[in-house]
Amino acid sequence: MASKTENSEKQKALNSVLNQIEKSFGKGSIVRLGDSARMKVETISSGALTLDLALGGGLPRGRVIEIYGPESSGKTTLALHAIAEIQKTGGIAAFVDAEHALDPTYAAALGVDIENLLVSQPDTGEMALEIVDQLVRSVAVDIVVVDSVAALVPRAEIEGDMGDSHMGLQARLMSQALRKITGNIGKSGCTVIFLNQLRQKIGIVYGNPETTTGGNALKFYASVRLDIRRTQTLKKGSDEYGIRAKVKVAKNKVAPPFRIAEFDIIFGQGISTIGCLIDLAEETGVIKRKGAWYSYNNENIGQGRDRTITYMQENPAFTEEIDKRVRAALAGGAVVSATSVVKLDDNPDTDDHDVEDIDENTDEE
């Protein structure tokens, strides 16, 4: 066991080297973790209460996040909701539209302040990632969304001919860029969300043939990776009005991973926040369901899920009360199912809310 004299000498030596490091590299270059504000990771709401629960509070600030999935599964919708949540708190958001496909009307419908949203449509992948780096280093931007990694085309590929081979060029670009900007992201507290597409590996007989574009660097640098899939098509009669999305937290460095959340995405409106609230209210026992009827404090509020959603939309004070009770129940340790939600096809009121299953094996690029 070390004596008090030895401990005192060690402490002096430690203080000396810490002072030397701070003189060489600046104040804050090395800190005790217990004294650091980084111990508590701040979060941003994803716009879906079920997903916030699966993430352990929401999307982490000052981290790299990857959202990937098949086409039309809700990747851009989820990113736009995160932007809207940041803007509600007075934050500044930027959208790097490498796909040149951003719809301002849809973004506004989701609650995005398009008048103050910074948008860039870069010509090359190098230009896009340099813009991201400069926005992050400015410490003035709270969230940057890159849509998408697959559309970050290296300059050499654009300047070359159509049939030229550029093996691994995009992967090297992403690896170099992430090495450069990850440290700045942590210091600035800016959240950077990369949207990514899926591709199929050739010749894979066993295991999952799906992979994401841009190489492996993003998988390592990302603190959170979200796999989003379209599981059902929502219908009223023969009219399709939305989809059911399932998100698996494939990686999470700030909370337990592999949790699953489901929510509705309504065409032209985005994530159904009230739908998420009803699902969790039923799971926590705040709202009861008997057959097709939903009730609160032994009073029926709606027959079928859709009518209950309509009732809550028309009564914001009631919705706020339910929201407070659900959050209090969750904070008190209420247990919910693995998916955090009720399966829509378990709803006996099938005339009110029809669904059509989606075969995920058909979702290919």
UniProtKB/Swiss-Prot annotation:
UniProt region (Disordered), positions on chain: 344-365
InterPro entries in alphabetical order: AAA+_ATPase (IPR003593), DNA_recomb/repair_RecA (IPR013765), DNA_recomb/repair_RecA_CS (IPR020584), P-loop_NTPase (IPR027417), RecA-like_C (IPR049261), RecA-like_N (IPR049428), RecA_ATP-bd (IPR020588), RecA_C_sf (IPR023400)
Keyword ATP-binding on entry: yes
Biased composition, class Acidic residues, residue ranges: 347-365
Gene Ontology cellular component annotations, sorted alphabetically: cytosol
Disulfide bridge positions per record: none
GO MF terms held by the record: ATP binding; ATP hydrolysis activity; ATP-dependent DNA damage sensor activity; damaged DNA binding; single-stranded DNA binding
Binding site for ATP: 69-76
Biological process, per Gene Ontology: DNA recombination; DNA repair; SOS response
Transmembrane segments: none
Localization in the cell: Cytoplasm
Alphabetical UniProt keywords: ATP-binding, Cytoplasm, DNA damage, DNA recombination, DNA repair, DNA-binding, Nucleotide-binding, SOS response
NCBIfam families noted in UniProt: tigrfam_recA
Functional summary from the UniProt entry: Can catalyze the hydrolysis of ATP in the presence of single-stranded DNA, the ATP-dependent uptake of single-stranded DNA by duplex DNA, and the ATP-dependent hybridization of homologous single-stranded DNAs. It interacts with LexA causing its activation and leading to its autocatalytic cleavage.
Family, as annotated: Belongs to the RecA family.
Descriptive protein name: Protein RecA
Organism annotation: Arthrospira platensis (Spirulina platensis)
Gene that this polypeptide is encoded by: recA
